[in-house]
Amino acid sequence: MILQPCAVADWYCPLPFRHAYVDSTGVAACCQTPRQSVSLDQWTTSPYLVELQQQILQGNMPSVCSGCQQQERTHGRSLRTDSQRDYNYQRFVDTKIDFVDYRASNICNFKCRSCEPAFSHGIAAEARNNTVMAKYYPVLDTKTVAIDAANIEWARENLAQINRLMITGGEPTYMPEIQLLVEKIVYDQLDIDVMITTNASFVNDFWCEATRLYPKLHWTVSLDAVGPAAEIVRHGTKWSMVERNVRWLSQHAASMDINTVVTNLNVMQLAPLLTFVHEIQQESRTPRGRHGDNGCRHQFHVSQRPYYLAVDNLSQELQDRAIRHLAQCLTLDLDTEQARTIHGVLAQVQQAKFDSVLWQRSVVFNTELDRIRGQNHLSLYD
């Protein structure tokens, strides 16, 4: 059943009614809510989901939704508001999973500093072998994790009812089981919007072939910095390869976004990133690319406290320098979303109060990673 578009004053999110997030720890309504120890075929009738839906239908904001509330207050948008837009502001009261966020495995060739063991087997290995790093992450029982085989089978068997399939990882382009799933969709020309989040390090020609053959394949490229800075923030990056793939996708993909996680590590690397993304947006515009007059979208996730990599978790000296850098960013040729985000980050950093404990936690984390990986994160602040 579909009701009228919900009023702005209502707290409504469509995801608990149409979406399932699946990773190695369970199933959830979205990536920001607690995982439940059920399989996909049990999810739609689970007591947890039913209670969550009832709270939303009564116009109440569930406590697990506070992250979106904070994002909306600070930056004017969130996963919830993006999802409302994606579903054309419809208000559902029944449950039919037509959108699966499928995070099949933590196999990944990168070890990004803002990531965690559940999404990178390399980080899982570091956490298991280092007592300092173990304090920052939930340590996994094994280095490599994958979602239950029953969930994989459910996804394959229910492709007919799925309208959108989001595939992340880990790095999906390095997972044979993901390639098999996408091959079926592409070669059978199924009517599914396939959204793959990638670090753009792929070398298998299949992904270029799929991009050419299947117009409903959407790429989200994770870019948090460019050049040598990218190789620190997103360890494992070979920038020349990533840049080549991003430029190729910008001209050949039917749909591509760039996603940036903003932390206290890359807050002073945003200007060169924004400049590079502007080039990619130019290359992706029609007729050179396939993204109309505006080019591909650049979206952001801004890290918040109490996370130790929160964008405003800076020493006083670095806070002052970050403010100057962000002001410089605002002089660049930015699109509306970029400008809004930079204004929001600038306001957040300007209003931040120094937290010595949280800052020290960030220092210890990054210094230990420098030692393990032979890097120097302080160069990110030069």
Task: Say what each PLM segment does.
Residues 177-183, 205-211, 269-273:
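Distinct, well-ordered alpha-helical segments
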Residues 2-84, 302-382:
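Accessory C-terminal segments flanking Radical SAM cores
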Residues 264-280:
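Catalytic cores of alpha/beta
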Residues 64, 72, 107-111, 116-119:
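Short pre-active-site segment immediately N-terminal to redox-active cysteine/selenocysteine motifs
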Residues 97-107, 116-149, 160-176, 188-206, ...:
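Core AdoMet radical
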Residues 64, 151, 158, 181, ...:
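Alpha-helical packing segments of well-folded alpha/beta enzyme cores
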